[in-house]
Amino acid sequence: MTPTGTPRVCEVSILPIALSCLFSSSAARTKGAKRLGTGPAPSDCIRDHHAVKATVSSPDGPRYGRPSFHFGPPTALFNKSLAILKHDLEHLENFTPTEEHMVPALQLVASATAFFEKEDQRRNELEKILPAFLGQGVKWRTPIAGGSAKPNGILLEGSFACLIFELKNEPGLEGDPFLQSLIVYDKIISHEVSFRSPPVHGPAAKLPLQYSGFITQSNFPVVLLTMAGNYLVVSTAVYTDAVYADKLLSIDLHLGSHGPANVLRLARVFMAIRNCTDTLSGYYRRLEPGSRPSVMYPSLTADPPEDQTKIPQLEYIAKVDRASGIPLSIVDEDDECHGIYLAKRTCSSTDDTPAEVVLVKFTSTYGQSAHRLLAEQDPPLAPALYSCNRVIGGLYMVVMEYLPDASPLHRFFPPSPVPYSLKADVIREALKKALELLHARDHVFGDLREPNVLYSHEGDRVFLVDFDWVGKHQESRYSPCLNPDANLGVKAWQVMEKVHDEANLQRLMTWLTGE
C-alpha cells in the first residue's frame, strides 16, 4: 500500500506471466545446454586468434568479459561454495597451513619455475605434487563426455566435475588454458550420458547417468585451476542462462627475496580450494534428478558470511528486461549482462520484505540514502526500498517495490508504445521536486535519462529509479566507463555537479514535449 492507501502491486496479474517466463526460461536453458558442446575440441578452440574469437563470440560462448559485453553476474551469486571460495581467497590470512601444506607448496613453486622441454614432462611433475593439495581422486588425462574432452586433470564427484585442471608448458604457447578449461566444462554439461567414476554406492554405480536429468536441478558449479609455466589462475564457473566464469586469483609463482611469503600464500590458496571442492562434493552427492528452476537464479551469501541473516529469503520468479522491467521468457545477449530479477518472499523469511512480488537488483554501487529519501515522500518519488545488503561477489543486493503499472518514459512512444498518454507538466514538477530534495542534501542523481523515469497513468505518478550513480556534489565523479552515447552532457570521470542534473532535466523535457 502507498501512504495514501492505494495498492500498487497486483500480484494476481503478474504471477501467471512471471511463472510462464520461469518455465519457458527453464526449457530454453535445457535446449541451450545441448548446444554448448557442439563446437570443436577444447584444444582446437584455442589454437589461434580466429578460433578463440569464434569460440567466445558465439551466441553460446562463455561469458567472462571477452569481448567487453560478454559478461554476466558474478558466479559467487549462484552457489555458496563458490562464494565462500571467493571470500576465502580475499582473506587468506584466516588459514594456518601445517607442514603437510608447506612442503608441497615449495615443491610446486620449484616445479612451476623450472623449464621443461615438453608439456608432458611438466604435467608428469605436477601429477606428483597436486594430489597433496587436491586429494588422490584427481583423474589425469581421462577422456570424458563421450571422448569429446580430455582435460589434464579433473576431480569428479560421481559424474559431476568439482574441479577442472588445464596446463600449458609456458604462457603464450598452444593457447589459453583458462579458456580450454571452460570449453571442457561446456562439453561436460552438454553431454547426454555423463562419465561416472566409481565407487558409487550400489549397483547404480555401473549405470550411465543421464546428465539431462540434472540440467534443471543444478547450475553445475565448478572450480577451474589453470597453469601456464609459473603462472597460476583460480577461476569459477556456473551454467544458468549461459556459462559464466570469473577469474578470482592470478599468481606468478616464484621464490626470490619474498620466497617464504610466496610459498605461504600458495599453501593458503590451496587450502581454500580444497575447502571448496570438498563442499562441492557434498553438494553433488545430495543431488537427485528432478526440476528445480531456481538454479537459474541467485543463491546468495552475505559479505561477510556471518551477516547471512540480513539477506532476505526470496523465491526468484524471472529475470527482467533491463530497459522495460518486463519478465523475460528468453534471455538475450544484452540481458545476460545484468542481475535484475523479480522475486517473492518465501514463507520462512523473517525480514521486513513484503509478501508481494519485488524487484531485486545487483549492483556494485548504490545510492541507498538518496533512494530512501525519495521513497519516503508523500506521495513517493521512488519505489519503496526494502533492503540493501552486501553479498559476496562485490555487489549490493537491492530489494525494492515492483511497479507493474509504471513504465519508463520511452515505452510511451513507438515502436512499442504503452496505450496511455503522458502528462508532461506532472512529470516536470515531480522531477523538479525530486532533484530539489536530492540537491538539498548535496546528492547528484547523475543519470537522469528516459529509462530511469517511470510514469504510472494510475494517479499520474512519477518515480525515479536506478540510483547506482548517485554521488556527492563536487566530490564524486562519473564512471570512467561512461558510455558517450548516454547523452548526459558529461565526460567520463568528470566531477559530478548539481547543474548536470538540471541540464538533463531540461534535455529530457525537451525530448518529451518537442519544445
Residue map of PLM features:
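Charged, often low-complexity linker/regulatory segments
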Residues: T2-K128, F270, N275-D278, G282, ...
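A short, conserved, highly charged catalytic patch centered on acidic carboxylates
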Residues: L77-I215
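Active-site beta-strand-loop-beta-strand hairpin of nuclease catalytic cores
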Residues: I154-I164, K344-E356, G459-R461
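Juxta-kinase regulatory segment immediately upstream of eukaryotic protein kinase catalytic domains
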Residues: A261-I330
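ATP-binding glycine-rich loop module of kinase domains
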Residues: I317-P380
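Conserved structural core of kinase catalytic domains
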Residues: T363, R372-R428
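Catalytic-loop of the protein kinase fold
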Residues: H439-S456, L464
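C-lobe/activation-segment region of protein kinase-like
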Residues: H457-E515
